[in-house]
């Protein structure tokens, strides 16, 4: 996920609205107001498993970091599936150095967040549209069955105006894998390895562009955790800050907060580029900070019929 031009565009326009800031998703109003999901006390989700599946390290922390923290706080076991090798996202490193630096940062994110494990699929960054989607799908189905994933967080497979093929290829592979992992005729050879069919029952989809938002998560209680997650993406955030400074300098401008010590500059950038966005999203729903999703939950279509007609055998 790239944010290099965030302040170049905002500075050129002289404003900072959602329409002008890349990555600020535009909510398309659903037929009914979105559900507000708030923190729950205790650990009601103990025993449940989620997988964060994104092409790049920083996608999850930026777009769903508060929600990831909420799920973990409520008892979920979490896994991170990183689809690409993130070889394109650094400021002044070689390709090989970039792969290593982002791999180390990914390990740091997993540790900071308290996720159980990371799986890297190692496809080349910005090249997922040249990879068989079936291949990615099969690997995800294997992991969903192996880990018994209940909930996924990923890009919206139907998000509009997405310019990065890594994002929509990953999203569509995730959507298909969620469905097919529950089918006994999809890749049955996996059952000989001890796996069983497994249905993914919940999906939190985020987007950089317009999206049908039907779920809003209150991340006020988990904002500090989200900031820590984003900070762990050190190589990528450094790239964003320094590229923004270069772009501003080319226009004869500077932002003092981005020009200080490295850590202070990164914190200022995180606040301006990401946390301010979450604040704007929250304000729309009477919350301090929030994240928006298209949420697909469990299928309850037969619940009433089962309650009325099921009998013990």
What role is predicted for each listed range?
Residues 79, 118-203:
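Internal alpha/beta domain cores that form substrate/cofactor-binding pockets in large enzymes
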Residues 104-108, 171-172, 176, 224:
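Residues on a specific face of well-ordered alpha-helices
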Residues 3, 7-9, 29-147, 302-306, ...:
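Active-site rim/loop-helix segments in enzyme catalytic domains that contact anionic ligands
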């Amino acid at each position: 996920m790239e944010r290099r031009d965030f302040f170049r565009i905002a500075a050129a326009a002289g404003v900072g609205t959602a329409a002008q800031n890349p990555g600020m998703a535009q909510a398309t109003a659903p037929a009914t107001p979105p559900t507000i999901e708030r923190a729950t006390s205790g650990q009601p989700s103990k025993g449940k498993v989620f997988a964060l599946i994104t092409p790049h390290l920083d996608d999850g922390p930026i777009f769903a970091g508060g929600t990831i923290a909420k799920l973990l706080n409520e008892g979920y076991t979490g896994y991170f599936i990183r689809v690409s090798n993130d070889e394109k996202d650094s400021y002044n490193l070689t390709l090989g150095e970039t792969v290593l630096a982002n791999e180390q940062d990914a390990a740091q994110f997993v540790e900071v967040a308290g996720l159980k494990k990371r799986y890297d699929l190692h496809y080349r960054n910005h090249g997922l549209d040249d990879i068989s989607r079936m291949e990615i799908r099969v690997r995800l189905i294997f992991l969903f069955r192996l880990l018994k994933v209940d909930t996924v967080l990923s890009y919206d497979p139907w998000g509009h105006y997405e310019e990065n093929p890594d994002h929509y290829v990953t999203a569509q592979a995730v959507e298909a894998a969620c469905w097919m992992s529950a089918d006994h005729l999809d890749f049955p050879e996996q059952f000989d390895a001890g796996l069983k069919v497994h249905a993914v029952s919940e999906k939190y989809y985020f987007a950089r562009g317009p999206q049908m938002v039907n779920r809003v998560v209150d991340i006020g209680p988990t904002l500090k955790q989200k900031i820590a997650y984003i900070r762990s993406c050190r190589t990528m955030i450094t790239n964003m800050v320094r590229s923004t400074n270069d772009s501003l300098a080319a226009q004869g401008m500077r932002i003092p907060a981005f020009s200080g010590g490295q850590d202070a500059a990164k914190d200022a950038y995180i606040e301006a580029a990401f946390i301010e966005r979450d604040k704007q999203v929250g304000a729309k729903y009477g919350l301090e900070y929030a994240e928006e999703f298209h949420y697909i939950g469990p299928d309850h279509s037969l619940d009433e019929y089962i309650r009325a007609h099921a009998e013990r055998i």
